[in-house]
Design a protein with these regions (language model features):
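A beta-strand edge to alpha-helix "cap/lid" segment located at domain peripheries
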Residues: 1, 47-138
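Short, aromatic-enriched amphipathic alpha-helices that serve as compact interaction elements
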Residues: 1-17
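Alpha-helical elements of Rossmann-like donor-binding domains used by nucleotide-donor carbohydrate transfer enzymes
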Residues: 8, 20, 44-47
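Short alpha-helical functional segments enriched in proximate histidine and acidic residues
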Residues: 12, 24, 52-55
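Short, well-ordered alpha-helical segments enriched in acidic and aromatic residues
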Residues: 16-28
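Short, ordered coil/turn segments that flank beta-strands lining enzyme active or ligand-binding pockets
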Residues: 27, 34, 101
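A short gly/proline-enriched turn/hairpin at secondary-structure junctions
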Residues: 30-40, 52-55
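Short beta-edge strand/loop motif at the mouth of beta-sheet-based domains
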Residues: 34-47, 68-70
Length: 138
């Protein structure tokens, strides 16, 4: 079975490979992360993904539901992260909206909740809680 466009992206993210993930985007592709950061163009996307992945020791993304219509993929994803400082964040729910195009991914939007970047946490008292958890952007 051929992996879906979203499967290819999640595999690159789980390998912590910003170059491979960015290479999937069209030259004028766009990215919106859960915490509101945006990138337009493959180099800006590579930089944003590199900053994000550089904060991690590991990450896993598990697709729990997936819909596909023409060039659009929508997926519910559970993400888990281990940060460089050993903090583990598990089973964080995300929605990925991916628009594919002839030159690569035209747009990726990741939804969950607006929050601060990963590196901005200081202690459990300083993080922005969403319910009882703090959520990273991808």
């Amino acid at each position: 079975m051929t992996p879906s466009p979203l499967d290819r992206l999640l595999a690159a993210l789980d390998e912590l490979d910003a170059d491979a993930a960015a290479a999937l985007f069209a030259s004028d592709g766009r990215l919106l992360t859960v915490d509101g950061r945006r990138a337009e163009g493959v180099e800006a996307i590579r930089t944003l993904l590199g900053d994000f992945l550089g904060q991690l020791r590991s990450t896993t993304h598990v697709t729990t539901a997936h819909w596909h219509d023409d060039d659009v993929s929508i997926a519910e994803v559970e993400a888990s992260y281990e940060l460089r400082d050993w903090l583990k964040l598990t089973d964080l729910r995300r929605v990925f909206l991916l628009r594919d195009g002839p030159g690569g991914y035209a747009e990726l939007r990741v939804y969950g909740a607006h929050e601060r970047p990963l590196a901005s946490h200081q202690s459990a008292a300083d993080v922005m809680p969403i319910g009882a958890r703090w959520l990273p952007p991808l």
